Design a protein with these regions (language model features):
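Short loop/turn segments that flank or connect secondary-structure elements
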Residues: 1-166
């Protein structure tokens, strides 16, 4: 985190695209004594936000879970655009209570296939040129990523049934 921008930072004006956090995830963070109300922000489901989620999860019904007139929670950010839980050496949350998206990143499941985000600011992306290398660097395996992805979707009210389990 001390090297510069990370996945835990957003550019000014891009806050609407921050990934949503579920109510159970908020409760877990609060229950662990690691965050109060000021760590979470309730924001409207903007058209850009819904479109971005639809791009990331094209097989799921984003509009039902995040209706146009609705809202969702996300982690708060500082004036500099950093997640409120980002410290000088990375995330200050215990791994067990981190939002599922944060535990997944930069790994992802897209149309049933494992992949990873190749954002320039991703430090892991600098060192990994294959999915196998990324999984090893993140200390995980494909089945764990699929499980986390299903868990994240379920917490957000996104029905995955057989759509993303291939």
């Amino acid at each position: 985190a001390a090297r510069g921008r990370t996945c835990c930072s957003v550019s000014s004006g891009d806050e609407e695209f921050c990934f949503p956090i579920s109510i159970p995830e908020m409760h877990a963070i609060r229950g662990a004594g690691q965050g109060g109300d000021e760590c979470f922000v309730l924001v409207p489901n903007s058209p850009g936000f819904v479109e971005q989620l639809g791009f990331l999860m094209p097989d799921l019904d984003i509009g039902t879970a995040f209706p146009e007139q609705g809202s969702h929670w996300r982690l708060a950010t500082t004036a500099q655009g950093d997640c409120v839980f980002l410290g000088p050496t990375g995330c200050m949350l215990d791994r067990e209570v981190r939002p599922t998206y944060c535990r997944l990143f930069p790994l992802w499941q897209f149309r049933g296939q494992l992949t990873w985000f190749t954002a320039a600011e991703c430090l892991a992306n600098e060192e990994c040129s294959s999915l196998a290398a990324m999984l090893e660097a993140m200390g995980t395996g494909g089945e764990e990523i699929r499980t986390l992805f299903r868990e994240m979707c379920a917490k957000l009210g996104l029905d995955t049934d057989d759509k993303v389990n291939s």
